[in-house]
UniProtKB/Swiss-Prot annotation:
The lineage of its organism: Bacteria, Bacillati, Actinomycetota, Actinomycetes, Mycobacteriales. Changing residue 154 to A: Reduces the interaction with PE8. Lack of interaction with PE8. Disruption phenotype: Disruption mutant shows a significant decrease in the biosynthesis and accumulation of lipid droplets containing triacylglycerol and in its tolerance to rifampicin. This is PPE family protein PPE15. Keywords: Host mitochondrion, Secreted, Virulence. GO terms for biological process: response to host immune response. It comes from Mycobacterium tuberculosis (strain ATCC 25618 / H37Rv). May play a critical role in the homeostasis of triacylglycerol-containing lipid droplets in M.tuberculosis and influence the entry of the pathogen into a dormant state. Is recognized by host TLR4 receptor at the macrophage cell surface, which modulates the host immune response, induces mitochondrial stress and perturbations, and induces macrophage apoptosis leading to pathogen persistence. Also downregulates NOX-mediated reactive oxygen species (ROS) generation in THP1 macrophages, which increases intracellular survival of bacteria. Residues 312-367 are annotated as: Eukaryotic-like SH3 domain. Forms a heterodimer with PE8. The dimer forms a 1:1:1 heterotrimeric complex with EspG5. PPE15 interacts directly with EspG5. Interacts via the C-terminal region with host Toll-like receptor 4 (TLR4). Interacts, also via the C-terminal region, with two cytosolic subunits of the host NOX complex, p47phox (NCF1) and p67phox (NCF2).
Length: 391
């Protein structure tokens, strides 16, 4: 199309007839917004993949995932740049339109020039309007040239603004057969689960039969070995009255002997258990006798024989008891230091130094007269005889 061949009425009408630069500016803003969103998505995508493969997930699988994701990341980056370029080109087209619109002669001015020319031609008597007609034609020619120049410039600017980067859909980053394989795996798992359920149901239903069939091998063994007939004969023999009476008598007799032996066994056990205390008591008595003999020897050595005397054939009486003559003088010496316990009628002899470390517990002191008692008496009581001196 040659805009110079078109009159200004057409060029001006076309320039003023459109919607203006508004739609192109809106398109440029939309492209810029899309470019910003794609750029943000690409940056987030790259950040997530980098953090995932360098911190949490490392290995051949992560490297394979990175290799599969790289084409999509490259597409996001390229598409964001292409969208931004398209937005800028749209803005450039809008600016070119604004410039062409400003250079174009308004259609009203062109129409007024044509109306003036028609009036001058109609009233041109004797050529008096010829100069005015020539000026009007010259002005119209300028309008023609101006509109043509505006359209040529607008066409050039629009052609440059229309150079956009080609866009393409993203490449496939996953295996196209993955969904089909997943569906097949799910179907196989469902079929396997159904088969397993059927198998479990069959097992549960067959358990009673299997348990009840455990007795069949025993029966078959008895039948194959001929033991079933022998067992039947034995049962018949045991069922006869004579054999049954003999067996019952033997069982009853054995039971009677067992019942009679139980008390005897209990008695023997008790007797065996009581032997230990008796042995302990006998050992204690022997130890007491040995200690008493040692104490008597020490006491005899510690008694001084001075002042003692005896008459041959005579004995000293203690009550109705005949005792050696030495007891009448030796006994007071052993009880001279006796002290009475407060609040009781018992007396305890004071200890005396001597070769004997201690007296045997249970030795009674000499009598102090009617109503006097020695210390507590318990256990074995030895009788100590002092050494007699014959004068």
């Amino acid at each position: 199309m040659d805009f110079g061949a078109l009159p200004p009425e057409i060029n001006s009408a076309r320039m003023y007839a459109g919607a203006g630069a508004g739609p192109m500016m809106a398109a440029g803003a939309a492209w810029n917004g899309l470019a910003a969103e794609l750029g943000t998505t690409a940056a987030s995508y790259e950040s997530v993949i980098t953090r995932l493969t360098t911190e949490s997930w490392m290995g051949p699988a992560s490297m394979a995932m990175v290799a599969a994701a790289q084409p999509y990341l490259a597409w996001l980056t390229y598409t964001a740049e292409a969208a931004a370029h398209a937005g800028s080109q749209a803005m450039a087209s809008a600016a070119a339109y604004e410039a062409a619109y400003a250079m174009t002669v308004p259609p009203e001015v062109v129409a007024a020039n044509r109306a003036l020319l028609a009036a001058l031609v109609a009233t041109n008597v004797l050529g008096i309007n010829t100069p005015a007609i020539m000026a009007t034609e010259a002005l119209y020619a300028e309008m023609w040239a101006q509109d043509a120049l505006a359209m040529y410039g607008y066409a050039a600017a629009s052609g440059a603004a229309g150079m956009l980067q080609p866009l393409s859909p993203p490449s496939q980053t996953t295996n196209p057969g993955g969904l089909a394989a997943q569906s097949a795996a799910v179907g196989s798992a469902a079929a396997t689960a159904a088969v397993n359920q059927v198998s479990v149901a069959d097992l549960i239903s067959s358990l009673p039969n299997a348990v009840s069939g455990l007795a069949s091998p025993v029966t078959s063994v008895l039948d194959s070995t001929g033991l079933s007939g022998i067992i039947a004969d034995i049962d018949a023999l045991l069922a006869t009255p004579f054999v049954a009476n003999i067996i019952n008598s033997a069982v009853n007799t054995a039971a009677w002997y067992v019942n009679a032996a139980i008390p005897t066994a209990i008695f023997l056990a008790n007797a065996l258990n009581s032997g230990a205390p008796v042995a302990i008591a006998e050992g204690a008595i022997e130890a007491a006798e040995g200690a008493a003999s040692a104490a008597a020897a020490g006491l005899a050595d510690s008694v001084t024989p001075a002042g003692l005397g005896a008459s041959l054939g005579e004995a000293t009486l203690v009550g109705r008891l005949s005792v050696p003559a030495a007891w009448s003088t030796a006994a007071p010496a052993t009880t001279a230091g006796a002290t009475a316990l407060e609040g009781s009628g018992w007396t305890v002899a004071a200890e005396e130094a001597g070769p004997v470390t201690g007296m045997m517990p249970g030795m009674a002191s000499a009598a102090k007269g009617t109503g006097a008692y020695a210390g507590p008496r318990y256990g074995f009581k030895p009788t100590v005889m002092p050494k007699q001196v014959v004068v």
